Amino acid sequence: MGDNEQKALQLMAEAEKKLTQQKGFLGSLFGGSNKVEDAIECYQRAGNMFKMSKNWTKAGECFCEAATLHARAGSRHDAGTCYVDASNCYKKVDVESAVNCLMKSIDIYTDMGRFTMAAKHHQSIAEMYESDPNNLAKSIQHYEQAADYFKGEESVSSANKCMLKVAQYAAQLEDYEKAISIYEQVAASSLESSLLKYSAKEYFFRAALCHLSVDLLNAQHAIEKYAQQYPAFQDSREFKLIKVLCENLEEQNIEGFTEAVKDYDSISRLDQWYTTILLRIKKAADEDPDLR
């Protein structure tokens, strides 16, 4: 055991001693609240010592103790901050403990009306879950909650960023209707801003691919509708690719479909999300040529 861990354990013992003294009759008469403040300081210092030793579990425990004492003393904001500190330690070793701490922090901030803070913490939880494919549904849930709070605070840009994550993962989980709805909403929102207008092209492209995953005819109608909403979309490589893919699927030409994707990818690299969706469309066409 290193020096820092030894000091941290001493500080924890000191904190517990102060709390025991505070509970006694004389403690309550003579500066009981000061003893609690001293105990909080000991736990926070111990937490930092454990952090220096990279003992993340013990560090998290110390910040949780400090948070509980802050909450008991009525210092809700400080309690929220300590739960966040605890979460940052736990997330290096135990995602669920990290999430539990952030949820406690969120409860405090929503009760205080600090919805932007609550939204950011929901976003952090979503980010923790998104690294595990088995937790994508949980990630979606927290991104949606974050977006909801951001919208309530008029942070439209932050809300849209979260909703785009929801759409991305919804499509991965084959909930294409949900993904389409979000991409279309965010595209429409982007068209209202001269700065964001150009990004609508990507969202329409993603929505069209989701349509193509469900129904060829729907995809054909959708891209015509998108071209009316945003005429510049018609001149884009994305629009032309969707058009060619639709034609190849209509003709049951899988080789043509593959070539069109390769040509596009040679100039504009397709990331894993696009590749996954396109492979699913190709596989479905292989298995059931009559997509119409």
From Swiss-Prot:
GO BP field: chemical synaptic transmission; compound eye morphogenesis; imaginal disc-derived wing expansion; intra-Golgi vesicle-mediated transport; intracellular protein transport; mitotic cytokinesis; neuromuscular synaptic transmission; neurotransmitter secretion
Membrane topology qualifier: Peripheral membrane protein
Keyword Protein transport: yes
Major localization listed first in the record, in broad terms: cytoplasm
Superkingdom in the source lineage: Eukaryota
Keywords linked to the UniProt accession: Cytoplasmic vesicle, ER-Golgi transport, Membrane, Protein transport, Transport
GO molecular function, one term: ATPase activator activity
Family affiliation: Belongs to the SNAP family.
Function: Required for vesicular transport between the endoplasmic reticulum and the Golgi apparatus. Also between the endosome and phagosome.
Listed name of the protein: Alpha-soluble NSF attachment protein
